[in-house]
């Protein structure tokens, strides 16, 4: 192995070795040595058509910091500033969230022209990915319920592991799904 001198090459070699086992769902990858400063997330979707200063909220994900804040925040409100730094029209706001996951952060919100501040703890990108996954599942479930007149259940298995199988079984056997005619 004299030519394996970095983590990427080692991961490639390990993946090839694992491939020789002829089993599924195996592999090795290298995570990289990028910046340790992670950009936090607010767990919201913004209105891309809004052209004014700030960020106009289009949708707030269930379980996000804005959904669980003490002040009721709704779609249509505008985030004018993050920790006192104003957000101008078209400005890249991500640098304002660098390193803020899990740290108290002040947002200035505008509701019909009236401004107020709230303090939240932004979430990591990984946590937001979990919220996006749950949102995707719920949207799929709603589509299946609507198109089947609630006759077909929708479940999704997140991964090939014991916890995911337990969740799948729990959902299949729930009062909501147990007596449905079919499962997707």
Segments from the language model and where they lie:
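Conserved catalytic motifs of ABC-family nucleotide-binding domains
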Residues: 76
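PDZ/PDZ-like peptide-tail recognition elements
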Residues: 16, 20-63, 67, 142-146
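Amphipathic alpha-helical substructures
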Residues: 1-25
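Cleft-lining beta-strand/loop regions that shape enzyme active-site pockets
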Residues: 1-2, 31-35, 56-59, 63-65, ...
């Amino acid at each position: 192995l004299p030519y394996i001198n970095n983590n990427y090459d080692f991961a490639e070699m390990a993946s090839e070795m694992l491939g020789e086992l002829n089993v599924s769902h195996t592999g090795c990858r290298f995570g990289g040595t990028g910046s340790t400063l992670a950009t936090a997330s607010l767990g919201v979707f913004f209105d891309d058509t809004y052209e004014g200063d700030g960020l106009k909220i289009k949708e707030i994900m269930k379980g996000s910091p804005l959904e669980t804040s003490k002040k009721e925040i709704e779609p249509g409100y505008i985030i004018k500033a993050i920790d006192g730094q104003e957000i101008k029209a078209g400005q890249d706001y991500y640098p304002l969230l660098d390193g803020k996951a899990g740290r108290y952060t002040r947002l200035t919100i505008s509701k019909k022209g009236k401004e107020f501040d709230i303090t939240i703890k932004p979430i990591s990108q990984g946590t937001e990915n979990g919220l996006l996954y749950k949102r995707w599942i719920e949207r799929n479930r709603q589509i299946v319920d609507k198109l089947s007149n609630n006759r077909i259940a929708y479940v999704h298995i997140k991964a090939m592991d014991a916890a995911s199988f337990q969740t799948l079984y729990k959902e299949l056997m729930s009062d909501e799904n147990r007596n449905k005619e079919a499962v997707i």
